[in-house]
Amino acid sequence: MKPVVLFVSLVFSIIGAEPEPDPKELPRIPFTAAKDARKTFTVKEGFELQLAAAEPLVAEPVAMCFDEFGRLFVVEMIGYSERQHEKLGRVRRLVDTNGDGRFDQSTIFAKGLAWPTAVFCSNGGVFVGVTPDLFFFKDTDGDGVADTKKKVFTGFGQARLNVQGIFNSLRWGLDNRIHGATAHSGGSIMKPGTDGKPVSLRGRDFSIDPRTLELRAEGSTAQHGMSFDNFGRKYVCSNSSHLQV
């Protein structure tokens, strides 16, 4: 059996009650309780679906990445897709303290982020995509909360008009670089405080050398969702063509 990590997030925000629904709107769809979530999936023979984390440990997850210690860092896009509050997004650190395959400890690693969409663990810290910026957070005292924050790059999809079209999917490539999907918003990328020529990402994805922080453009772009197989082949997703290679 191949276990698949499952996260369950209720449709309401854990930070406060939803506004009263307009009676003229379509009726609300009831949420599915965490204990019943697996029943809603159809799983291919040979695979097994297991619940790894649910509210209140995690809410509204959109991206995740394991570090070298097996801790899971999860981007929570709180407040999507409304613009009532701009900086509700955050990153959670989940830990399985007893090794039973279920996360039982949750810490807010970073907060106050506007529409975070990507996360990648490297060099003892965490890269987080928060359009138009890519930040690097690090916990230096071991309390599970980031105490350093550095803006590594800026210029990604500055308009932020469409949350489905901003950069996402930070993945490790066989070339030992961190790859990312630029999406439809493109960008003109620079390191903050420098006068160098910006890297244009119009219609192109990107990759970063985590040691030197050199960024370069890469091929065509995905909309939201990108990964590699064991042979280095790149798979991308878009609304029109769900899976491309």
Which residue stretches match the model-derived regions?
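Bacterial N-terminal signal peptides
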Residues: 2-13
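Beta-propeller domains with acidic blade repeats across secreted/periplasmic ectodomains
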Residues: 16-245
